[in-house]
Amino acid sequence: MIDSFEVKPLRRNFREPFATATGTWRTRESMVARVKYMDGHVGFGEVAPTPGFRGEMFSDAHRFLSLWEPRMEIPDHLPLCRAALGCAGSSLWRTKTAFPKIKTAALLRSPEETNLPLSNVLKAKIGVGELGAEIATIENLLTRLPAGSRLRLDANGSLSRTEAKAWLDTFEGCSQIEFLEQPLAVTDRNGLMGLAESNSLALALDESLLDVQIAEEFLADGWPGYFVFKPTLCRDWREMETFLRNEPTRCVVSSVFESPFGFEAVLRVASLVETVAGIGVNPLFVEDDFSLHAMDMVLQPGEVDIPQLEELWRSI
């Protein structure tokens, strides 16, 4: 049972404007929920509205959580509030055994970066500029990848079927590309299945997976690719954890620029699968009191522990 509940808003600035297919980010706004249970355990969850993903506005979430009490139902139109409270109640906050270490992918601010991170897996956003120019940029990037590294391409659902086919045809059989993430809009399920079945280059679902039920439907339909889960945006944590445990080699855990509270939760979830996690936060933010996690290529869930998060919470 819940003993107490609190919520606090946060605001962090990116070092540089961050461009995606849905626009340019300069500031990250979120809210952190702290839940203390009658047995003394504490859990945290973060409401982190993210452009391009379904979810309530920051103002709506803040208004609701400011008045929320443990016995109140969370309405369907507030999935991020559900996600945050589900996260706070996860058993991963209570785990006493050591978590396995997590290998991480490096997110490029731009595929034209000259000093590439020394990571085995890098991620580049596409669908931001003109098709031909972007393909040429990625071709150039592949010539500069560290030996043995792989590249993930993330379109954020911005491509048409014709554009997606152009990407797949260009890089057909390219072993340096691990997968093309969410090439088509969430609503184009037939298009996604068709692309996945007709090309050797692996695809991954991302924006499509805010509900575990959708992942299960794709799995039942024979989806051959990857499933990218953003736990902070997933409304049912218990179902998500079960799915990840059942598909550890095909699920990728990804972050959405959380504060240390949400980021630590994502790290702990990433310990459930065997793939390289799509996470990375601090290098993109201005250095501040929230820079608790090291941004190494290998991270240790639990290294930032509950007492440290409690101390940070009190400082907000």
Q: What is each PLM-predicted segment?
A:
Residues 52-55, 131-135, 158-162, 174, ...:
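Loop/helix-junction capping segments adjacent to catalytic residues or to phosphate/diphosphate-binding pockets
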Residues 1-151, 156-158, 162-165, 291-316:
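N-terminal capping/lid subdomain adjacent to the active-site entrance of alpha/beta enzymes
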Residues 110-112, 187, 283:
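Short, polar loop motifs at secondary-structure junctions
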Residues 107, 122-131, 150-157, 175-188, ...:
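Catalytic beta/alpha-barrel core
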Residues 132-144, 160-172, 189-196, 214-221:
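Distinct, well-ordered alpha-helical segments
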Residues 25-35, 207, 211, 215, ...:
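Long, acidic, intrinsically disordered low-complexity segments
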Residues 3, 102, 119, 148-149, ...:
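A structural micro-motif
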Residues 60-62, 67-72, 191-194, 198-202, ...:
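Shared catalytic-loop signature of beta/alpha-barrel
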